[in-house]
Every structure is written in structure tokens, then in C-alpha cells.
């Protein structure tokens, strides 16, 4: 079945069959000629009611013949992304065909992504690898395999490509280093889910001396296939997937469509293959800039970190939900003035939660520790990452004046991503 839709067709279907889009497009004329005529989705409104899949107003049809995945948070608190089976097949086929750019005939690929608890990454990668037109071999280990067993299997079976999330690849690299091992037969490390930074690349190079490092591609379980990774892409760069969706970069304050190269804005996706759960001008949560001029086929763009209003933030294998963190801060401190600052020291992520006490509810000595404990309870992975020296969590009470604001709008930024992304040093086109 053909699941690709022209824009007008998609908009008409969404407004007729989705309560959310009927309201969202209420002031839009029946016929449109460009995306710019349509309002950008507010993710908070989009995901309202998504916990009740039988009555979620975004959906255009009953929940039949579908796949359900989790997008961030715990199973009970997280949001869900839904695909008709033919939509899923279109997604993995398009993504899989893009992998031909990164794989060679005879490659033996270890799939080290994670499975279970409604996570999509392992299943998605497995299904996509099945669509690669080059002859390859997949070893579907998952990310739960013991490091010793994995290292031995790589040697024994001459596995030369490792595909996984950066935090797991780094954890495996740390184990290899601690045990005095290097895997010279590995020729490629393909990562997804989070950016890799210079200090982390150096750690990988020490134990995988002959491996090139590249993104496997840019996709998310909510927005779908967002960017293809080609050999001419530097770290952090991808190419727009023509035919699968339409990418826009918008000014974060004015909403103006950005066409020039090098100017950073928020990345917005219109997916042309999704009917059950349409995504029309949906902010994916990342900032980006164009690397090539308008009209370029498969136009290249560079990721530049998370948006300040992102609905979720990735730090290694950890997915943080800013809205949930804000609710925790308010419950414990009585204050709505807080900021999450993400930095990096060598190969370790530094996560700092700054909060300012309300004038009517002054700070108490126990609040920082209570917040620290509450975050670990909400995100148990923090304890594991801290033990592996991959993450440091710090809580600090501060004055409200110390919380950073956007230099143009003056708005409070709840998420401040200060990590230096590889794409930030590239020149403009």
C-alpha cells in the first residue's frame, strides 16, 4: 500500500479525521499551497491525552493493526508513538536503503541497540538492516550483552561494524581499556540517539584504532526518519530524506523560515508517510542549521543541540522530560524557577539542576538532597551512569537572577545545553 501523501491530501485527511487537527487547522482555508500557511504544532497540546490511546484526539482512526512504541519516560509516564504496519514498513525501508551509504558488502554488523519496555531502537535497526540492498550479516545482540561475551564474539566472528547508542559504545570502550584490550578488526562505529563529542571520540579511538565513526542516521520514534547519514557528512551532519518528509528550520523566536546556511533555528518535520498519527510541522526538539543552499537534492544540515523548549532531552542513554522535572521541582520546593544545564568534562556529562526559591517559600537545607533523590527515583539510569563515571548530577539552589534567559526574548530557558557539538565548527555554504 502506498503510504506517501501529498501535503494537501495529508492536511485534508488530518482535519477530517483527527479532533486535534480539526481544531489546530480551524482558521486555515480548505486548500493550501505551502507549509508556511500552517501553524507549527505545540508539542504540549499535541501529546495531551496520549495516555489513553483509545480516545487520543490526534489519531485519525481506531487503534487497529498498529505498532505501539514508547517515546521518552517510563512506560506509565511516557508518551506513545503509533504506526500502522504499512507505515512502519515504509519507515524501515526508507531508512534501511539510506544505510547503503555507510555499509559495504560483507560487513558484519553487531546490533547493540536496546530492546524491551516498548523501546523501538533495536527493532527499528533490525528491520532497517533487513532492507539494506548491500549483502551484510547482522548479529542482533541487543545492548544488554555482557562486555566480555561481546568482545569475544567480535573476535571470533570477525564482526567489523558496531551499531549502538554512544553511551553503550563508550561503556564498552571503557571496559576494553580497563582490561587492556583493543579491537583492531572493527572498521566502523555507527551511533544514534545522542551526539558524540571530541573527548568521547578519543576514548573510542584508543580501543577501536581502525574504526571510522559515523551516525547511522537521524530518526526518532515520534517524528520518524529525519536525516540520512552519507560518507560526505561530518559528525552531526545529515541529509534531508526526500520523499519521506519535509524539513524546515525556523527562527526560535519569530517562527520565520530560515533558508540561508549557518543560521541556527529549531528543526521542524512534516512526515509524508504517517496517517494514523499525523505529524505536520512538528518540532522534533533539536536545533539545526543548513549546510547547503536551497534547492540542493537531499539538502545537508547540521545538528546544533537541543531546543530550550524541547519536550525531552537525551544525555547518553538517559532521556529526561523537562516538564516532569519542573513538576518535581515545584512539588518539592514550591518554586517554578529552575533550569537544567548540560555540560561536559572530558567524556563525562555534567547535569546541573539550578533552582531559585520562591519569596514565600524560602530554601531549606534539605531541598537539594530531596531533589537529588527524587530525580534518581524518577530516572534510575542516573545511578548507573554515575557509577560508570559517565554522568555527574548536581543540584544547586541559587538566586533567580542567576538563571539564564534568552538573549533576544528575555524568556527563561528551562534547558541550557552547553555541550560543544561537532557541527558548530563547520563553515557555512
Label the model's feature ranges.
Residues 48-182, 188, 197-203, 207-208, ...:
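Active-site phosphate/ATP/adenylate-binding loop shared across adenylate-forming ligases
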Residues 1-70, 76-97, 347, 352-354, ...:
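Nucleotide 5′-phosphate-binding alpha/beta core
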Residues 162, 268, 273-384:
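AMP-binding/adenylate-forming catalytic core of the ANL superfamily
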Residues 11, 186, 211, 335-337:
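Core-facing hydrophobic residues within beta-strands of well-ordered domains
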Residues 190-191, 217:
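A short, hydrophobic beta-strand element of the alpha/beta-hydrolase
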Residues 14, 205, 328-330:
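Hydrophobic C-terminal alpha-helix "anchor/cap" residues
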Residues 18, 165-166, 193:
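Helix N-cap/beta->alpha junction signal
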Residues 196, 202-294:
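Conserved AMP-binding/adenylate-forming
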Amino acid at each position: 500500500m502506498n503510504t506517501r501523501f501529498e501535503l494537501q491530501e495529508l492536511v485534508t485527511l488530518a482535519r477530517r479525521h483527527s479532533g486535534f487537527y480539526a481544531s489546530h487547522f480551524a482558521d486555515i482555508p480548505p486548500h493550501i499551497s505551502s507549509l508556511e500557511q500552517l501553524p507549527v504544532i505545540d508539542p504540549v497540546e499535541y501529546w495531551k491525552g496520549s495516555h489513553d490511546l483509545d480516545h487520543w484526539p490526534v489519531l485519525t482512526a481506531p487503534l487497529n493493526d498498529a505498532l505501539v512504541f514508547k517515546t521518552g519516560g517510563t512506560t506509565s509516564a511516557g508518551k506513545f508513538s503509533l504506526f500502522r504496519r504499512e507505515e512502519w514498513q515504509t519507515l524501515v525501508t526508507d531508512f534501511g536503503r539510506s544505510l547503503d551509504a555507510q555499509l559495504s558488502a560483507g560487513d558484519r554488523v553487531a546490533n547493540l541497540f536496546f530492546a524491551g519496555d516498548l523501546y523501538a531502537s533495536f527493532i527499528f535497526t533490525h528491520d532497517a538492516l533487513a532492507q539494506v540492498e548491500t549483502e551484510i550479516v547482522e548479529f542482533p545482540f541487543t545492548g544488554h550483552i555482557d562486555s566480555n561475551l561481546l568482545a569475544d564474539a567480535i573476535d571470533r566472528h570477525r564482526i567489523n561494524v558496531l551499531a549502538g547508542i554512544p553511551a553503550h559504545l563508550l561503556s564498552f570502550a571503557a571496559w576494553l581499556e580497563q582490561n587492556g584490550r583493543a579491537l583492531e578488526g572493527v572498521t566502523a562505529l555507527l551511533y544514534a540517539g545522542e551526539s558524540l563529542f571530541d573527548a568521547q571520540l578519543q576514548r573510542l579511538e584508543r580501543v577501536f584504532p581502525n574504526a571510522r565513526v559515523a551516525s547511522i542516521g537521524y530518526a526518532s520514534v515520534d517524528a520518524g526518519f529525519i536525516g540520512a547519514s552519507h560518507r560526505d557528512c561530518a559528525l552531526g551532519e545529515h541529509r534531508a530524506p526526500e520523499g519521506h518528509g519535509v524539513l524546515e528550520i525556523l527562527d526560535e523566536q519569530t517562527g520565520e523560515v530560515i533558508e540561508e546556511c549557518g543560521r541556527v533555528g529549531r528543526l521542524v518535520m512534516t512526515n509524508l508517510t504517517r496517517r494514523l498519527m499525523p505529524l505536520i510541522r512538528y518540532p522534533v526538539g533539536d536545533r539545526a542549521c543548513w549546510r547547503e543552499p536551497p534547492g540542493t537534492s537531499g539538502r545537508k544540515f547540521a545538528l546544533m543541540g537541543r531546543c530550550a523548549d524541547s519536550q525531552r532531552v537525551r544525555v547518553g542513554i538517559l532521556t529526561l522530560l523537562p516538564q516532569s522535572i519542573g513538576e518535581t521541582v515545584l512539588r518539592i520546593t514550591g518554586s517554578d524557577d529552575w533550569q537544567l544545564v548540560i555540560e561536559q568534562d572530558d567524556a563525562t556529562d555534567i547535569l546541573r539542576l539550578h533552582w531559585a526559591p520562591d519569596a514565600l517559600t524560602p530554601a531549606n537545607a534539605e531541598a537539594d538532597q530531596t531533589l537529588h533523590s527524587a530525580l534518581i527515583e524518577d530516572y534510575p539510569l542516573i545511578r548507573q551512569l554515575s557509577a560508570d563515571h559517565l554522568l555527574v548530577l548536581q543540584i544547586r539552589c541559587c538566586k533567580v537572577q542567576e538563571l539564564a534567559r534568552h538573549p533576544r526574548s528575555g524568556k527563561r530557558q528551562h534547558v541550557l545545553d552547553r555541550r560543544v557539538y561537532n557541527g558548530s565548527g563547520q563553515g557555512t555554504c
